[in-house]
Amino acid sequence: MAVPPVEMYSGSFWNRMRKPLPLRTQVIRFTVVFVIVSFILAVALQITHERMPDPKVTKPLPDLGFELLTKVPGMYVLADCCIGFLNILSVFTAFKLYLLHRHCVGSGEPELPCNIPGVSRFFLSVWLCKENCRIELRNIHTIAWIRFITSYALLLLFRSAVIVMTSLPAPDDLCQNPPKIENPVKNVILTVLTAGAGSIHCGDLMYSGHTVILTLHLMFHWIYGAMVHWSFRPVVTVVAIFGYYCIVASRFHYTDDVLVAIYLTIATFIAVGHNADGAPWQLQLFIRWWPCCGANSREVTEDSQPVMVAFKSEAAGQSSRKVVDERNH
């Protein structure tokens, strides 16, 4: 049996493991991880569809939310509209966070080739709500994206296991006569490309994927959207609550599916947290060993701190080191 090297138990080894990866590398690699997790979830959805109890034999479970809210079958479409609206608003907020980062580092506001009165100022001006700004603005857009995408990937990966473990009877009308999946590979690809909207899947109940993304947007704007404009918090809160109502009223999910998803999403988003180094170092361990998709060490200045960069001379075949300080440029 091979004996682990002594340095694995030394403080220097774990210090290297805890050293943060460049933020740009984290953005690229965690986005790739999210795509991989999406395929895992797509396969899990297909397994769940095949394992779902026969609706003709097993009736939907008793649900207090179903008893209190009148059934409106088409409301799930409005839930999708809520998600679409929040997607657009989150992209807009992320861009405004990028402008805040540029303002913090002294880059100024970007300019369009052609100036459109009103429009250019609305999109390219820096919005800052000082009452809710308690976070360092440098790299805030990158850190916010890392926090969002890692939280989403963790929740979808856990959901992949949960929906396969226990099969529940479907409460919605669309799955009372579930269609047969003729081409499994095509269905998996459509699930990833359309986020489930263009594929066949029934029985994926515990917990609600719609609620996960609604709550993620809610948490994103509660923390970061409020830094851009004070109105984002109340607007997103109302939209998210209405989306929850649409999910239950349409019988798309049981009430427990929604409640569990809300709790898990909030807990995960808080646990991942906001850190100048990006994702928690434990999560970075899963992408640290990658030989591609970004550098494993900081070769450029991200926080206006001097770093060491190695330059290789092609003529002499030798390496020289140079300290790069952003403040000197």
From Swiss-Prot:
It is a multi-pass membrane protein. Residues 48-74, 169-211, 255-257 are extracellular. It is an enzyme of class 2 (transferase). Residues 1-26, 96-147, 233, 279-329 are cytoplasmic. GO terms for biological process: ceramide biosynthetic process. Pfam families: PAP2_C. GO terms for molecular function: ceramide cholinephosphotransferase activity; kinase activity; sphingomyelin synthase activity. Its main location: membrane. This is Phosphatidylcholine:ceramide cholinephosphotransferase 3. It comes from Trypanosoma brucei brucei.
